[in-house]
């Protein structure tokens, strides 16, 4: 659960979430 979310953020979510903030 947490591991999958972190891997996804490193991919694209992360990038998208950082730009939105």
UniProtKB/Swiss-Prot annotation:
Give TM regions: none
Give the signal peptide as a residue range, or say none if absent: none
Q: Which domain of life is it from?
A: Eukaryota
Keyword set, alphabetical order? ATP-binding, Lyase, Nucleotide-binding
| Reactions listed under catalytic activity | ATP = 3',5'-cyclic AMP + diphosphate
What is the E.C. number?
4.6.1.1
What GO molecular function terms would the record report? adenylate cyclase activity; ATP binding
Q: What is this protein called?
A: Putative sperm adenylate cyclase
What is the protein's species of origin?
Mus musculus (Mouse)
């Amino acid at each position: 659960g947490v591991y999958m979310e972190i891997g996804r953020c490193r991919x694209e979510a992360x990038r998208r979430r950082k730009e939105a903030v």
